[in-house]
UniProtKB/Swiss-Prot annotation:
Similarity comment: family membership: Belongs to the RNase HII family.
Full protein name: Ribonuclease HII
Catalysis performed (reactions): Endonucleolytic cleavage to 5'-phosphomonoester
HAMAP family from the UniProt entry: RNase_HII_B
Pfam families per the UniProt record, alphabetical: RNase_HII
Name of the gene this protein is made from: rnhB
Gene Ontology biological process terms in this record: DNA replication, removal of RNA primer; mismatch repair
GO MF entry, a single one: RNA-DNA hybrid ribonuclease activity
Organism per entry: Oceanobacillus iheyensis (strain DSM 14371 / CIP 107618 / JCM 11309 / KCTC 3954 / HTE831)
Family annotation (PANTHER family): RIBONUCLEASE H2 SUBUNIT A, RIBONUCLEASE HII
Entry function: Endonuclease that specifically degrades the RNA of RNA-DNA hybrids.
Entry-linked InterPro entries: RNase_HII, RNase_HII/HIII, RNase_HII/HIII_dom, RNaseH-like_sf, RNaseH_sf
UniProt KW Mitochondrion keyword: no
GO cellular component terms, semicolon-separated: cytoplasm; ribonuclease H2 complex
Length: 261
């Protein structure tokens, strides 16, 4: 019998159509192309195994919350504390108990393509999610820490159903109608918080890209409002916009200046 083509073997391995016994038989195939495919397959399997282990570890807080009798668990995170322009954005998300998304992590550790793909998947599979924007004028009035907390609280309040328990990235939130845990570096420790991190990051980035269309001189589509060299130079050259945060140190001197409209 003529052996299967290398292309056919590659397709079958990729689609998971071969049994373990059939894969073991392929190691006897002397063709270099087949052995190269098997090597790549091994590496992919090892990578998948590591991703599964990481995902299981990131479910530790969730498992404990479920054991304590909670049904709806929310992950909560915010992005945009550091930028000189734009809002701070928080997301809260309730995921089903059997939710799985290998590779989920702190949004800062993901590529833009991954974040966009993950955000779409999370929205499709979430029981509920809510995203809250607190603009720069509020940030300047109450400070960035309080604005971050307000964004988180608004995101949680908008969830339907309301959560029984919240897993929050680092920030303690008083006044919630549910129990909660504030977890240091929670976006790398909890699947729910990581999912909220992704939703918030994608939402804020999209908002800043839209702002770039109105103010293209500041590079908001790439710096997302952060104080890059190019952004600071643009401020020196053109002044500030109505979306800059005067309460942040580099912009104090512009507080009473005429804004660029």
């Amino acid at each position: 019998m003529k052996p299967a083509s290398i292309a056919s073997i590659k397709s079958q391995l990729t689609n998971g159509e071969l049994t373990q016994k059939q894969i073991e038989e392929l190691y006897k195939d002397s063709r270099k192309g087949v052995q190269a495919i098997l090597k790549r397959h091994e590496k992919q399997q090892e990578k998948q195994a590591l991703l599964k282990q990481a995902f299981i570890k990131m479910n530790t807080y969730e498992k404990e919350a479920y054991r304590n009798g909670n049904h709806y668990i929310a992950g909560v995170d915010e992005v945009g504390r550091g930028p000189l322009a734009g809002p701070v954005v928080a997301a809260a998300v309730i995921l089903p108990k059997d939710f799985q998304l290998l590779g989920i992590n702190d949004s800062k550790k993901l590529s833009e393509v991954q974040r966009n793909e993950f955000s779409h998947y999370i929205k499709q599979h979430a029981i509920a999610y809510q995203i809250s924007f607190i603009d720069n004028t509020i940030i300047d009035k109450i400070n960035i820490y309080e604005a971050s907390k307000q964004a988180m609280k608004e995101a949680i309040s908008g969830l339907q159903p309301y959560p029984d328990h919240a897993l929050i990235d680092a920030v303690p939130l008083e006044g919630l109608n549910c129990t909660y845990e504030a977890i240091i570096k929670g976006d790398a420790e909890s699947v729910h918080i990581a999912a909220a991190s992704v939703l918030a990051k994608v939402a804020r980035d999209d908002w800043m890209k839209e702002l770039h269309e109105k103010y293209p001189l500041y590079g908001f589509n790439s710096n997302m409002g952060y104080g890059t060299k190019e952004h600071l130079q643009a401020i020196e050259t053109y002044g500030v916009t109505p979306y800059h945060r005067y309460s942040f140190a580099p912009l104090h001197k512009y507080r009473h200046n005429t804004l660029l409209n």
